[in-house]
Amino acid sequence: MKWVTVVLSFALVCCQYSLWFGKGSIGRNSSLREQIAVQEEKNQTLALRNHSLAAEVYDLENGQEAISEIARVELGYIQDGETFYRLIRHNR
């Protein structure tokens, strides 16, 4: 009977060791959950960026307004018959 108790105690210690310090331990599981949360947040940010870029590509492919806006902002494009006004703020 004493021998069975020793064997069962040893098996329990082995199971507890793998639970607390092994490859699939509780600490590692917690660390992986934190990494997953961080990665999901990054993925969500990138998905929003991708959606925005896809909408911009669609506008560039299907409409002239996006092209005109980019030309105005980045290149200073002014169409015929338009008047350009530049407003300058004075910091006082």
Swiss-Prot record:
Q: Which residues form the signal peptide?
A: none
Keywords annotated in UniProt: Cell cycle, Cell division, Cell inner membrane, Cell membrane, Coiled coil, Membrane, Transmembrane, Transmembrane helix
Give a yes or no for keyword Cytoplasm in this entry: no
Q: Which residues lie on this side of the membrane: Periplasmic?
A: 22-92
A GO BP annotation: FtsZ-dependent cytokinesis
This protein's record includes keyword Transmembrane helix: yes
- Localisation per UniProt entry: Cell inner membrane
* Cellular component, GO annotation: cell division site; cell septum; plasma membrane
Q: Which residues cross the membrane?
A: 4-21
> What residue ranges lie in the Cytoplasmic compartment?
1-3
Look up and give the membrane topology term.
Answer: Single-pass type II membrane protein
Coiled-coil boundaries: 28-50
Indicate where this protein is primarily found.
Answer: membrane
Question: What InterPro entries has UniProt attached to this entry?
Answer: Cell_div_FtsB (IPR023081), FtsL/DivIC (IPR007060)
Assigned protein family: Belongs to the FtsB family.
Q: What does this protein do?
A: Essential cell division protein. May link together the upstream cell division proteins, which are predominantly cytoplasmic, with the downstream cell division proteins, which are predominantly periplasmic.
How does this polypeptide assemble, per the annotation? Part of a complex composed of FtsB, FtsL and FtsQ.
| Protein name as catalogued | Cell division protein FtsB
Q: Which organism is it from?
A: Neisseria meningitidis serogroup B (strain ATCC BAA-335 / MC58)
